[in-house]
Amino acid sequence: MNPFEKLNLFLSSIRILKNWYIFPLVYFRLIKKPYVIFLTRDNLQIKIILDKSNYWFQVFVEQFLQEPYSENNFKIRDNPIIIDVGTNVGFFSLLMSKKYPNASIYSFEPNPDNYNFLIEHIKNNQQKNIHPYNYAVSSKNGKVTLYISIENFTGHSLYAKTENKIQVQSITLDTIFNDNKIEKCDMLKLDCEGAEYEILMNSDESLKKIENISLEYHDLNLQNFSLDDIIKKLKNF
């Protein structure tokens, strides 16, 4: 990151955070506590675990300051339905919950540890419009294997195989729509470490009801699908 980018980052932290003065201390790893709480100007409390990897801080910067899943170019109702697949610890869901207080947000996170932090964030911020589920989303309903990344709490995957793995419950996108009687989804956000391919390629009924999709695609599961497959698929809806 060049000096101009760093300056812009620090200025963004002042714009976003009430306790912005903590931000550079975390950036330069000058705080020797297990965690800090960032307080946003719209009154969100965001817990950041401080460890050697610094991944929590990096994800906070990405979600709150860089906003890769920004819906600014989308037309979204004041009372939208938003589905967050790969919620992690809830940063995106919290952002949308504050921005759209009348929204219904369905948040899916398969990793139990991340899910517990998601629940903590929801409770601490009293966000009653976030509906959390300790589920993976894939092309099947039932048990699936989730491979655990020891180094990166955002890297747990159905496809990036590691020695550490657990069985988790999975649900399809079509089942999510049917169970919750969703007739229109204003935004689907996908960050699911390779599962985005099988989700989108096997959800024809749901895709008809989705207005906007914001996704991160990964170089995983490429033996079965490619980014071109997703693009061709979505052009039909």
Regions flagged by a language model, labelled:
Residues M1-F237:
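Phosphate/nucleotide-binding beta-alpha loop and adjacent structural elements of enzyme active sites
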